């Protein structure tokens, strides 16, 4: 599991930062990539990374401001043009379906893969399978905006091979049956319960990715005990009133949410273009004064998510 930040700016592109898009690489977990937001030129940013459009399985849109969605039509079309055939699902607020369908229709763009568009109308679970569970809550922004909590389900423990070998069980079909939790009888009459030969499960990771938002309770709830919290930090602490007026957060407010939620790690993104050069490091300094395990994303930077 690895983050690749494709765009980390706020509102409009700048020389140093493109607009919002985050790839969550799940190559080891499911051989796929999930994308969170898709601002203008996202597909161009992808060219500079290891992200492959054909592997993008899901796109989660936080809200419908242009800096979070204007890259969608181009990416969807290019994925088809480049030979993508596997299904893709886009999740987002009401209106995302109309935006995509009109853009593709007017431009006579035809995708050759199954494209499903899911409009989120209620908080709660938006996706679940045997590996992941994705929940959402409304945030506090000028328009409807969602944050996402991605919960990796616990992974079954490893088969205790050494313990089986000590009992004279040889590698082969019995190993698989025991791994599946079956009760088996050996040739000498010994009964073995597979559950007795499985190590402790690996606890799944929790990732929280928030859209644009003021400081709010929903952010804390989504981030509770997260292994990684990705939070916007559009403004410095001294501009807290301006952040409130424009429905955004400061770096210190992001750190406060991480602290209250008992998150393990905080990554700041959505940085205003007013912070050019190294001036953005002041945002990082402010956040670390409150929550030490804070990092700040820059375009094309990767962050592995360890267990």
UniProtKB/Swiss-Prot annotation:
Keywords: Endonuclease, Hydrolase, Metal-binding, Nuclease, tRNA processing, Zinc. It is an enzyme of class 3 (hydrolase). InterPro entries: Metallo-B-lactamas, RibonucZ/Hydroxyglut_hydro, RNase_Z/BN. This is Ribonuclease Z. Zn(2+) 1 binds at residues 63, 65, 141, 212. The keyword Metal-binding applies. Homodimer. Belongs to the RNase Z family. Disulfide bonds: none annotated. GO terms for molecular function: 3'-tRNA processing endoribonuclease activity; zinc ion binding.
